[in-house]
């Protein structure tokens, strides 16, 4: 494939194509976020514990992580346009299935099917845009593609909370239908990307072993929460996950055409994105899952009010977004990540202090601040991931980063559920259990600061310099 940079100058910015992919990203995130204010109602409808509904979120995200690595091969084999269009169709149909679910297992199954569509939708579209953008447009493209990750969560909790309060939670999944139909039609016109006449073979063995290892890891986390003191079962599940993941890593490093090219981790900026960035993603994903549960089950608030306050958190994301690129250009990504991480640790201390007697306005300020910090870190890590890779390595870096970040999000939900279930019996009150959970998450956030110090001082200057 030819270089994205033309000999005559930088490649033109593919605005229409980028907006369509951003719209698909928006649809995917809305569906993941809109469910959170309705978790207690979904649990009541199915007769399960609210924390159990974490499976409906984590199963979707883990499916993305397992299948995203194959998305590059599928796009090369069949072409970006038909794959992207088919993915939108699958995602939209699965949304209807979620709305018609009659049990938690059925809902989880439909969410897994959504993950199949999502795994082919956003990564394929994002890679198609990156391939035609060129390095001169990288920061601009990344900024546009990350807007949905910041804007969709603002609308989704309010919409989800309003629907859950005024009607049935089942209607929250139908919002994807008009977006999906419109996106499907536009994709047939706007998406570019030729199919590879001789695509590399798909690493089926790597896909199966890695998928089994990730699934085993999620099941091991769930077994800790459910099995309680049955440590033999927990140990067996954990050992199985470790063995499968070790075998997968060995295979990926020694096969000719690996599902995921781990050797791109030799690029320091990408390696730190995978380590610190994944932990950062894990921690920030846990918060929107915990807050609606705390607001409804402990504070006694309605789904609408809890959704409104979660939206305030994501409003902070948007408010700071225009300043994220200037911040990175002025101070450098390394300094931004370190300072942002330290402030985030303090913010988790504030989240731990939230209580039902605290004025709603004060809670809103804390959540807004949390959203501001979340946005800065999120954008910095996404930019860092692609700052020093290009050419053929861009495909490998995109696949690896997308899979790892989705896995981190899925594990973030599972870890939050595990912490809450573990700490609740030990805490004097339910409110204390949530406070301890936020403090543990703050400690994990502190580890990202330590890792950020390993970045070179001039990290990512190639794409952040004026």
Question: What is the predicted function of each stretch?
Answer:
Residues 1-13, 196, 453-466:
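Intrinsic disorder in cytosolic terminal tails and internal cytosolic loops
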Residues 9-17, 203-205:
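N-terminal membrane topogenic signal
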Residues 14-39, 46, 50-59, 70-72, ...:
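12-transmembrane solute porter fold
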Residues 68-205:
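Helix-loop-helix hairpins in multi-pass membrane proteins, especially solute transporters
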Residues 76, 191-192, 218-226, 249-253, ...:
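Membrane-water interface at transmembrane helix exits
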Residues 99-106, 188-191, 221-227, 249-252, ...:
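Transmembrane helix-loop junctions and nearby membrane-interface residues
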Residues 147, 151-167, 215, 219, ...:
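A gly/Pro-rich, aromatic-decorated transmembrane alpha-helix motif that marks the paired
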Residues 165-276, 441-442:
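Hydrophobic transmembrane-helix bundles of small-molecule transporters
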